[in-house]
Amino acid sequence: MPPIYRYDHMHLRSRDVKKTAEYYQQMFDAEIVESIQSDGRPRTDLDLNGLTIFIAPVPPEAATPPAPAEPYVGLDHFGLCVDDMDEAVAELKRRGASFTLEPRIIRPGVRIAFVQAPDNVRIELLERGRI
C-alpha cells in the first residue's frame, strides 16, 4: 500500500515575525502561539482555523533576494476558502487588507480575490459553489 500524505504546515520566513504574525491575527483571526524551532531558536506559529503556519525570523543582516518578477517558478500563493466572498472582502478591507485582485468569477461556481500579505506572500480567497 502506498504511503498516505497529509498537509501539515506552511513555513514562512520574515524579517519582522511579530508584525507578520499580528497581520494574520488582525486580518484572519489567526491564533498566535510562541514556539521553538528544532534548532532551539524561537519561532512563532499561527493556527488559522486548523491551518498551521510557522513564521521563522530572518536575521536583519541576512541578504535576501527581491521577490521574483512574473513569470517565475516556485510557490505562487496559498488559498483560503470563504463562504461569502463579499462579506470576507468587506471585512478584510475594513481591517486594512490590500487587494491585488478584486473579486472576480474565474469559471462557473468559483470566485477569487487576492490579498497581499507581508513578506511578498499572496493569499487567494476562494468562494466555491455560490455563483
Which functions belong to the PLM regions below?
Residues 125:
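Short glycine-/small-residue motifs
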